[in-house]
Amino acid sequence: HFIKAEGEENVQPEFPFLCLLVSGGNSQIILVKAYNDMEILGQTIDDAAGEAIDKCSKVMGLGYPGGPIIDRLARQGNPKAFTFSKPHIPGLDYSFSGLKTSFLYSLRDWIKDDPDFIEHHKTDLAASLEATVVDILMDKLRKAAKQYKIKDVAVAGGVSANNGLRNSFREHAEKYGWNIFIPKF
């Protein structure tokens, strides 16, 4: 469905283009060469981005699905309040299990000192988690765009509704001259 996604100016991407497919089940960078010719350049080797967000939301007691809840809370928080580990995976593959573990262990330690830590910091936790996920996603996508000399970049999947990711796409468009294609929600 990402091939039919319309960009900010109601145009479709020209082949070849990149698509970041990001959901609860997938995190992939796809090189779309034609309607029936696609190549997965990178994908998750463990948890998908959306799955990690959902699990972190559950650990915080926020419910499922966690994506919309984290997105809403993140808008009110400081994305630099907390730092979580980012994977150092070579190539264009993704890994989110380490982030999930880092988040869980950090919460466990903070709750020892303050049993109400999550309640006192949930907007900053959400914003910091979202910022980390977006940084991981965009770092690999940026590398793929540079490596394959691609300027048309699309995003698809449930996590494409996330405001932090959508804003990062817009920032990358301005900074790197990308033509972006973001689904309308």
Segments (PLM) and residue ranges:
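Conserved phosphate-binding catalytic cores of ATP/NTP-utilizing and phosphoryl-transfer enzymes
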Residues: 1-17
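Glycine-rich phosphate-binding/hydrolytic loop that grips phosphoryl groups
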Residues: 1-2, 183-185
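Short beta-strand scaffold segments in enzyme catalytic cores
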Residues: 19, 27-31
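Glycine-rich phosphate-binding loop plus the immediately following alpha-helix
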Residues: 23, 32-78, 100-101, 105-110
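Glycine-rich beta-strand-to-loop/alpha-helix junction loops that act as flexible
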Residues: 23-25, 153-162
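A contiguous, well-structured pocket-lining segment that forms one wall/lid of small-molecule binding clefts
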Residues: 72-153, 163-180
